Regions:
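Conserved acetyl-CoA-binding loop-helix of GNAT-fold acetyltransferases
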Residues: 72-85, 110-111
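A general lysine-centric signal
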Residues: 94, 133-134
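Conserved GNAT acetyl-CoA-binding A-motif
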Residues: 87-100
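A short, internal acetyl-CoA/4′-phosphopantetheine-binding micro-motif in the GNAT/acyltransferase core
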Residues: 64-71, 100
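Conserved active-site alpha-helix within GNAT-family acetyltransferase domains
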Residues: 77, 101-118, 123-127
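Short loop/turn motifs at secondary-structure junctions
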Residues: 60, 91-93, 113
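Acetyl-CoA-dependent GNAT
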Residues: 4-62, 67, 86, 118, ...
């Protein structure tokens, strides 16, 4: 698998799979190198990961998407570890992510060393678990 920064040519692929972000923000994140594209050996897109900054100073992984037929084969773990290394190289010591309490992703992140750091209660959604990881 290959991990690269998303470009304008990846816009439709991302837009068609990410209902949680506005179309204009996708373009902004592409230009800011805040979306990674996962590609298979044929150079076909198989997934993506996007991030931002919590409090504008702590890298926060917003979402990982892996196309159905490529799931459970290590692509998610690979992109998380890649992102962690990128953030470490940029000088960050702490990173964050979150997942809903009714999703299995919480176990995935804990296996990768993320620790529960709190939660967010929203009116219409399950509890959102905040997770952090120290990169030192």
């Amino acid at each position: 698998m290959k991990i690269v920064f998303a470009t304008d040519s990846d816009y439709e692929y991302i837009r068609n799979r990410d209902p949680h972000i506005s179309e204009s923000l996708i373009l902004s994140k592409i230009k800011g190198n805040e979306i990674y594209i996962l590609r298979n050996q044929d150079e076909s897109n198989i997934g993506w990961m996007r991030y931002g900054y919590f409090w504008d100073n702590t890298p926060f992984m917003n979402m990982i998407w892996v196309d159905e037929q490529y799931r459970d084969k290590g692509a998610g773990k690979q992109v998380v570890l890649f992102w962690e290394e990128q953030m470490k190289q940029k000088g960050f010591n702490l990173i964050m992510t979150s997942t809903q309490a009714d999703e299995g992703a919480q176990h995935f992140y804990r296996k990768l060393g993320y620790k529960d750091a709190g939660c967010l209660i929203l009116d219409t959604q399950p509890l959102e678990i905040l997770l952090t990881k120290n990169l030192n």
